[in-house]
From Swiss-Prot:
Catalytic reactions on record: 1-(5-phospho-beta-D-ribosyl)-5'-AMP + H2O = 1-(5-phospho-beta-D-ribosyl)-5-[(5-phospho-beta-D-ribosylamino)methylideneamino]imidazole-4-carboxamide
Listed GO CC annotations: cytoplasm
Taxonomy of the source species: Bacteria, Pseudomonadati, Pseudomonadota, Gammaproteobacteria, Pseudomonadales
Residues in the signal sequence: none
Species this protein is from: Pseudomonas fluorescens (strain Pf0-1)
Name this polypeptide is given: Phosphoribosyl-AMP cyclohydrolase
Residues annotated to bind Zn(2+): C78, C95, C102
């Protein structure tokens, strides 16, 4: 029997990009990487678990901030090389900058313009020395 994880086209580092979207509004919240273990645990625990390339370890979204992403649905694209996670974003903050989405800048008139407000000061969210989930 074929394992569902074998259907994914992992990159040379054994990773696949994962896009988290709000399951109610469809808004793109963030993009992160998943390895096989992260994807398997995400399915098993019904919460987003990513692979932190900078720290070289699993990253359970919300483990420090409390901003957990509860999984509602998982989709695989037509090329089997991108995952979409339809999630409920607990606390309404997905970005380490304290915003709802990591995609808070819009290209306008040749420049990037910040269009989404900071909902909570990142220093109040994360412990000292921890800059980014």
């Amino acid at each position: 029997m074929k394992n569902w994880l074998d259907e994914i086209k992992w990159d040379a580092d054994g990773l696949v990009p994962a896009i988290a979207q709000d399951h109610k509004t469809g808004r793109v919240l963030m993009m992160a990487w998943m390895n096989r273990e992260a994807l398997e645990l995400t399915a098993a625990e019904n919460r987003a678990i990513y692979w932190s390339r900078s720290r070289g370890k699993l990253w359970r979204k919300g483990e420090e901030s409390g901003h957990v992403q509860t999984l509602h649905e998982m989709r695989l694209d037509c090329d089997a090389d991108v995952i979409i996670l339809m999630v409920e974003q607990i606390g309404d903050i997905a970005c380490h900058t304290g915003r709802q989405s990591c995609f808070y800048r819009v290209f306008e008139n040749g420049d990037w313009k910040t269009v989404d407000p900071v909902l909570k000061d990142p220093h109040a969210i994360y412990s000292a020395g921890h800059k980014h989930e």
